[in-house]
Amino acid sequence: MKILITGGAGFIGSAVVRHIIKNTQDTVVNIDKLTYAGNLESLSDISESNRYNFEHADICDSAEITRIFEQYQPDAVMHLAAESHVDRSITGPAAFIETNIVGTYALLEVARKYWSALGEDKKNNFRFHHISTDEVYGDLPHPDEVENSVTLPLFTETTAYAPSSPYSASKASSDHLVRAWRRTYGLPTIVTNCSNNYGPYHFPEKLIPLVILNALEGKPLPIYGKGDQIRDWLYVEDHARALHMVVTEGKAGETYNIGGHNEKKNLDVVFTICDLLDEIVPKATSYREQITYVADRPGHDRRYAIDAGKISRELGWKPLETFESGIRKTVEWYLANTQWVNNVKSGAYQSWIEQNYEGRQ
């Protein structure tokens, strides 16, 4: 099987590419614009494979994407290319509209025209797999807001959309486009919505890598508000395995939620990281002493949590990592890969971190 992957140099995309090349016989065509979060070093251990191909291109460039489709003749598309950081979407939403909405439209149109011209067998087996987020659903009741006896709800595949940030609104828009292209044109699409990912090769603007690296550098560990926001954490390699299972075994027209069964308050996540660092690289005082509280994000969702029962029942997928095992692997990876970290932390990234976090104190 030949799979065209957009955004394959990003955090989740590179995990998918590594998984496919290392664990299957499928061929990958990786399309990536290589924006700040795209890093080919994340693919260095598979880049010489004769089943791996890289194309430096923008999904908004329809002519170039058409050329790539015609050259490689993919059997499936896995669409991961996206702007994905909520804070960046608040200060600069235009890039999110362009990539996540306009880019998805452009890719859908190229894929639709390509699919329409395929022979019957290849046409029937083709899949356009759109990878999305649980943030499109908005947020869920927080334990602080309900009585102890009440069972807290989870996001399911039929939860109504209620995005609350420019990022989640742009992803919700792209989800709707994908489903419309199936209903209107018959394009065999699948949508997956995932919870918060973590693991190796994560760009250090996100909570877990930011805390690990700031802790090691003796910098403040910024916590939004009281740190009581709850997220479900999914180890990225578990997610990659699920995504490949969906594109190869999932049913066209379906939606699958993918979660890690690990609801944690942000502050507890930071405590766990600090305690691991105290154990692995101890210093005179606990890393917890570096925690600092900053002004909360505007419109910050209080709780996300996914019901991943459907993908478990229908495809047999379950996460292999607990949060405790996955976060230990993640911390150990960052300790062992300082060169990768140094290479991605450019001057532009440092300026953004200073503006976004230090300006909130």
Curated annotation (Swiss-Prot):
Pfam families: GDP_Man_Dehyd. Binds 1 NAD(+) per subunit. Keywords: Lipopolysaccharide biosynthesis, Lyase, NAD. The active site is at 134 (proton donor), 135 (proton acceptor), 167 (proton acceptor). Coiled coil: none annotated. Its cofactor is NAD(+). Belongs to the NAD(P)-dependent epimerase/dehydratase family. dTDP-glucose dehydratase subfamily. Homodimer. This is dTDP-glucose 4,6-dehydratase. It comes from Salmonella typhimurium (strain LT2 / SGSC1412 / ATCC 700720). The gene is rfbB.
